Curated annotation (Swiss-Prot):
UniProt similarity note: Belongs to the NAD-dependent DNA ligase family. LigA subfamily.
Signal sequence coordinates: none
Cofactors (names): Mg(2+); Mn(2+)
Family matches, as NCBIfam families: dnlj, PRK07956.1
UniProt entry keywords in alphabetical sequence: DNA damage, DNA repair, DNA replication, Ligase, Magnesium, Manganese, Metal-binding, NAD, Zinc
Active site: K117
Ranges for domain BRCT: 750-833
Function: DNA ligase that catalyzes the formation of phosphodiester linkages between 5'-phosphoryl and 3'-hydroxyl groups in double-stranded DNA using NAD as a coenzyme and as the energy source for the reaction. It is essential for DNA replication and repair of damaged DNA.
Amino acids binding NAD(+): D35, V36, E37, Y38, D39, S84, L85, E115, R138, E175, K292, K316
UniProt keyword Transport, yes or no: no
BP GO annotations: DNA repair; DNA replication
Protein name, as recorded: DNA ligase
Native organism: Xanthomonas campestris pv. campestris (strain ATCC 33913 / DSM 3586 / NCPPB 528 / LMG 568 / P 25)
């Protein structure tokens, strides 16, 4: 009689067989067993694990389905940002990309890794000791959403790495996508069942990963291709991008078979054309190709610019186009007042999406294209994403059309629409008196990358603004649960009488009579003979209501309580988030971050004259003037005061950066004021001759001539300073500069950090802080934090489960610090956790 196999051995054998089948199917494209056999093996494994729950593990193939997310996705901070790529649409742009790399690295024919650019959803997969522990979306590049449970359902993603030699921590970056055939089959099945079909494979992939129930995601035919790595700790990777991809394939990750190594711009363009010709026959959607410098050391030398690497480029295919009819041209007002013309179109399918609106960019673009209502136009999804009107089919223009003109008044508030000299953009002059601008300002203020008020959707923002409940963003911090519930009750009522019927359920007799009196006061005929004013809802809210008793009749209140909690949570923020949330024109996240790093305190920034902003890296004259204009407005200063008075707290204030001492001087200020004829050389001469604007204003020409300043420059300077507003700006800027410099230590008094010149390595898991936080604190004390141990390492910080780095440090005689010693050292030097 044959003995029954040991359950643990059988489970191990089944797991290995199933994962091997997954690897052969998704990575090697060499299916070895039939689907029915695969299903039989999986069912057997499920039965064995159910009978022996002590043998179940997180990396078992049976654990791909069954995880339920919380009511929302948790945020994940990417250790290494998931950067976007620069785009190219022409051969010339590709040639320029190659030229820059050639010159920087002094290589005549750089070698690149070229690969298709999948039209899916970018994700990051984190593995620790070979096991999948977390998956996140790209999000804004710095912060994504934890979609681990959903990613477990994607069979192409390994739950445990194959082979050996992988780093202790490995983040793999790639694209989740929906194959075309699977997309069509899924939609066909949905039509048979009367279910909802997917618009296109890209939307299908993105929507599937954002399901809160992983069982729904598991029903979607998703796949995955790896294209790079993020954080790597305690381990090494091959020296080139192409060999790194080959290594990822050996560890179990699918990598596109279309990846190639090519040389120079000619090799890149040949690859681009070949993939473009094959595009329609590929089993998945792509919207271009990606070029990456193959040499990883070269990538590090090239570095990054803004939010994109200098060593990579996305070469987009020509946008897909269709023709349709312009039914109307309307104006949309943005948060800075920009009036953007939008074409309302007869619905048309473009690249798998129904397009009903397309941007016309600005009035100059409309005039150049001569777009008119009634025209047949070519609609393009530029970069396969943003619909735009690319041209007019003039021969199909109907008779009687008229050239379009920018309206003179804002369609929302009636304020004048004006165009600043030299600008392409027209703007509503109503500023925050314009409801459209207020709504956009609110949307921006509460967005995730700004104040991050979760749960405040666009429609409810419209209700808040239209009702007059909030006039400025600071009014958010005056809201309470009762107001929110009343607001929803009123905004969802289709008539005053419908509202009164509902209100009666939540009010005592006296309070209800008070509401009826208020209704009469705003012009509502309680008998119902006369029609109610169209603005009755807003008028009623402005008139005020008594407190409702929500316990008289049960009503859903959790949403309002959650929203108030989110508003309360947002009170504690950082300076860069606060600055970004203010919605200052031209001030994005990177600019806000730079302002925070250089100036340190809101009170400093909000009172600086604009020329001083120009010394911050990446801030030019246009951005500096925009900052100055914003803070010059009394209404904006009042809005900031209101936010602070209502409890918004900026928790990361710090002194101005010592770098300002080397960046600011009287000569620099002369240069940055944009005075005609005052070049950097002339600014140095002027600064050598005199020390202040007060002295310059009082000075005669002779001392300046004797200092070598040409007479035309002196005349231009004197003419500029003769205007009172210029003299006031110059003297205010110098006073502000002197005040800033007075806060900084003298150059010879700046003390070296306790770890200056020392190289430190961190390994293992720390309990009190993340490794990234430890790195930041050590770097602030002067250390260079490296990824590998060598004889030059000053000391190694070893947390729990320290790996090979600890062994190497001990063999080299490197000093070992435990977490307690690290925390004590940080505390001693003002970096307490």
């Amino acid at each position: 009689m044959t003995a029954s196999p040991d359950p643990a051995q059988r489970i191990d054998a089944l797991r290995q067989r199933i994962e091997d089948a997954n690897y052969r199917y998704h990575v090697l494209d060499e299916p070895q067993i039939a689907d029915v056999e695969y299903d039989r093996l999986l069912r057997e494994l499920e039965a064995l694990e159910a009978a022996h729950p002590e043998l179940a593990t997180a990396d078992s193939p049976t654990q791909r389905v069954g995880y339920l997310a919380a009511s929302r996705f948790a945020e994940v901070r990417h250790v290494l940002p998931m950067l976007s790529l620069g785009n190219a649409f022409s051969d010339e742009e590709v040639a320029e990309f190659v030229r820059r790399i050639s010159e920087r690295l002094e290589r005549k024919q750089p070698v690149f890794c070229a690969e298709p650019k999948l039209d899916g959803l970018a994700i990051s997969l984190r593995y620790e000791q070979g096991e999948f522990v977390q998956g996140a979306t790209r999000g804004d590049g710095a912060t994504g959403e934890d979609v681990s449970a959903n990613l477990r359902t994607v069979k192409a993603i390994p739950l445990r790495l194959r082979g050996t030699g992988w780093p202790e921590v490995l983040e793999v970056r790639g694209e989740v996508y929906m194959p075309r055939a699977a997309f069509e089959a899924y939609n066909a099945q949905m039509r048979l069942q009367g279910g909802k079909v997917l618009a296109n494979p890209r939307n299908g992939a993105a929507g599937s990963l954002r399901q809160l129930d992983a069982r729904i995601t598991a029903q979607r035919p998703l796949s995955f291709f790896a294209y790079g790595v993020g954080e790597v700790a305690d381990g090494a990777l091959p020296p080139t991008h192409s060999t790194m991809l080959a290594q990822l394939r050996e560890w179990g990750f699918p990598v596109s078979q279309l990846v190639e190594v090519v040389q120079g711009s000619e090799g890149l363009l040949t690859y681009y054309r070949r993939i473009g010709e094959a595009r329609d026959g590929l089993p998945f959607d792509i919207d271009g190709v990606v070029y990456k410098l193959d040499d990883l050391a070269g990538q590090r030398e090239m570095g990054f610019v803004s939010r994109a690497p200098r060593w990579a480029l996305a070469h987009k295919f020509p946008a897909q186009e269709q023709s349709t009819t312009v039914e109307a041209i309307e104006i949309q007002i943005g948060r800075t007042g920009a009036a953007t013309p939008v074409a309302r179109l007869k619905p048309v399918h473009v690249a798998g999406v129904v397009v009903t609106n397309a941007t016309l960019h600005n009035a100059d673009q409309i005039a150049r294209l001569d777009v008119r209502v009634g025209d047949t136009v070519i609609v393009r999804r530029a970069g396969d994403v943003i619909p735009e009107v690319a041209g007019v089919v003039a021969e199909q223009r109907p008779a009687g059309t008229h050239a379009w003109q920018m309206p003179t008044q804002c369609p929302v508030c009636g304020s004048e629409i004006v165009r600043e000299e030299g600008q392409a953009v027209w703007r509503c002059s109503g500023e925050l008196t314009c409801p459209a601008q207020r709504k956009e300002a609110f949307r921006h203020f509460v967005s995730r990358r700004a104040m991050d008020v979760d749960g405040l959707g666009e429609k409810f923002i419209e209700v808040l603004v239209d009702s007059g409940v909030v006039q400025g963003v600071a009014d958010l911090y005056l809201l309470n649960v009762d107001q929110l519930l009343q607001l929803r009750l009123i905004s969802t009522a289709d008539s005053p009488h419908a509202f009164l019927r509902e209100a009666r359920e939540h009010l005592a007799a006296g309070a209800y009579a008070q509401v009826e009196q208020t209704m009469v006061g705003i012009g509502v005929d309680l008998a119902g003979v006369q029609p109610a004013p169209q603005t009755w809802q807003a008028d009623l809210l402005r008139a005020g209501l008594p407190a409702f008793d929500w316990n008289r009749k049960k009503i859903a209140t959790k949403w309002a309580e959650n929203l108030i909690e989110a508003i309360e949570t947002s009170r504690d923020t950082t300076l860069e988030r606060f600055l970004f949330a203010l919605g200052i024109e031209h001030v994005g996240e990177s600019t806000a971050k730079a302002l925070s790093a250089w100036f340190g305190e809101l009170d400093v920034i909000r009172h600086l004259p604009w020329p001083l902003f120009k010394r911050v890296p990446d801030i030019g004259g246009e951005v500096a003037r925009s900052l100055g204009h914003f803070f010059d407005q009394a209404g904006n200063q009042q809005a900031i005061d209101d936010l602070l008075q209502r409890g918004v707290r900026i928790g990361d204030a710090h002194p101005p950066s010592p770098k300002l001492r080397g960046a600011l001087s009287f000569a620099v200020l002369l240069e940055d004021l944009d005075i005609p004829k005052v070049t950097p050389v002339r600014a140095q001469q002027l600064a050598a001759a005199t020390a202040s604007f007060d002295a310059l204003i009082a000075s005669e020409a002779d001392p300046l001539l004797q200092a070598g300043v040409p007479a035309p420059v002196i005349a231009s300077l004197q003419q500029w300073l003769a205007r009172p507003e210029n003299a006031a700006l110059a003297t205010a800027a110098q006073r502000a500069m002197d005040a800033l410099l007075a806060q900084l230590p003298q150059a010879d008094a700046v003390q070296a950090g306790p770890l200056d010149g020392q190289t430190v390595v961190i390994t293992g898991t720390l309990a009190a802080l993340t490794r990234d936080a430890a790195k930041q604190r050590l770097e602030s004390l002067g250390a260079k934090v490296a990824g590998s141990v060598s004889k030059k390492t000053a000391f190694l910080v070893a947390g729990e489960e320290a790996g090979s780095k600890l062994d190497k440090a001990q063999s080299l005689g490197v000093e070992i610090w435990d977490e307690a010693r690290l925390l004590a050292f940080l505390s001693e030097h003002g970096q307490a956790v």
